[in-house]
Design a protein with these regions (language model features):
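Conserved alpha-helical substructure of the radical SAM core
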Residues: 46-47, 75-78, 101, 117-242, ...
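Active-site/binding-pocket entry motifs
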Residues: 64, 96, 118-121, 249
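Immediate flanking context of iron-sulfur cluster ligation sites
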Residues: 94-110
Length: 361
């Protein structure tokens, strides 16, 4: 069975100020939530560890399993699929202790404090025996590689890469993960985590393999778009259900402020060419979405209007605007104050303009 292990030290960690602030906020919130549970007698539960989340549970590139999608230091590792079955990992001692600690009102790892799958129990629930939960079925993350060609200010990817024993999942391993997804009856696979999926040298085989074994599964990819630049990769991408292009601005300068080493010109061309490649084959899938993180340097109304016009011009299916708080100094106050409410419809992402239903701007 999988056994708890101490978090491995990250070699040469980056020390960006916003990461340090984020760590302080997480620790402070963890302490507050633990105190709140002690005073009220109400513990917590984790939707992901109950098997009811469509996100968060992640199979990493080295086949370790994490309970969350921001496991930069390995503190969320619940087991290793090279040593144990998924059932042994998911119901094993590490995951069980996380569930038990939460039920007692303890926040076992700081990332729990800001996780969307954390739920507060009622007093009645807190007095009941801890339910075992079930195996995930709604969705999981699958990380084919932890390598990336850009360096986002809000992402501690290099720390995670130093924790991984393998930075690239082999094709044989991926095939086994597809079999696992079929065994679990997963409704969705999010083919993403802390790396750039299209950097994998095997991407041309990976996506068709997943689709062949999981014909009815929704497969979602997130990419910065820069290396989705050949017909071979575009052909592989047709095996997915949806592709989110993370492009956070309308020019190189704007994008590179958050996503270092990025290129708006290349990413925009990648979106345009993927639309053309799909449409030339008479297809409507995958759904192609421009994912636009909102910061205080890219959120002026005129800028968003221009982004919508540019998205419309190349024919993507939608553009979505996502508020974020990392880095904290880049937070979009225009969004928080409701000054961007005329741009698309409100949903769980933030704001979204869907050209298929809303039409042209």
């Amino acid at each position: 069975m999988a056994t708890p292990s101490a978090t491995r030290t990250i070699r040469n960690p980056k020390t960006r100020f916003n990461w340090r602030v984020s760590d302080i906020v997480r620790r402070s919130k963890s302490n507050w939530l633990s105190l709140k549970a002690k005073v009220t007698g109400r513990g917590y539960r984790c939707v992901a560890l109950e098997g009811e989340s469509e996100y968060n549970i992640t199979v990493n590139s080295d086949l370790t399993v994490s309970c969350n999608c921001q496991d930069y230091d390995g503190s969320g590792h619940i087991g290793d699929l090279k040593k144990n079955t998924f059932e042994e990992v998911f119901f094993g001692p590490v995951a069980t202790k996380l569930r038990e600690d939460l039920a007692k009102g303890k926040i076992p790892i700081p990332v729990c404090s800001r996780c969307g799958d954390l739920r507060r129990m009622s007093r009645a629930e807190s007095k009941q025996p801890l339910p075992k939960g079930r195996l995930p079925y709604r969705g999981m993350l699958l990380e084919n590689t932890v390598r990336c060609n850009v360096d986002c200010i809000g992402c501690a990817r290099e720390g995670a890469a130093n924790v991984r024993t393998s930075k690239q999942m082999s094709l044989e391993e991926l095939s086994k993960m597809a079999d696992l997804a079929k065994h679990l009856g997963l409704q969705q696979i999010f083919y993403l985590n802390l790396g750039e999926p299209f950097l994998s040298p095997n991407i041309g085989q990976e996506l068709p393999l997943l689709r062949s074994k999981l014909p009815d599964c929704r497969i979602v990819i997130s990419t910065n778009g820069i290396v989705l630049n050949t017909d071979a990769k575009r052909e592989a991408a047709l095996s997915s259900s949806q592709i989110l292009f993370s492009v956070h601005g309308i020019n190189n300068e704007m994008c590179e402020k958050y996503m270092i080493r990025s290129s708006f010109d290349k990413a925009y061309a990648a979106m345009r060419d993927m639309v053309a490649y799909r449409n030339a084959r008479g297809l409507k899938s995958p759904v192609l979405e421009w994912k636009y993180l909102l910061f205080n340097w890219n959120d002026k109304p005129a800028t968003l209007r221009k982004a919508i016009e540019m998205a419309q011009e190349i024919g993507v299916d939608m553009i979505s605007f996502w508020p974020t708080h990392n880095p904290f100094y880049g937070m979009s106050w225009r969004y928080r104050l409701g000054l961007l409410n005329r741009f698309g419809e409100k949903n769980w992402k933030g704001r979204e303009w869907d050209f298929r239903t809303r039409g042209r701007i």
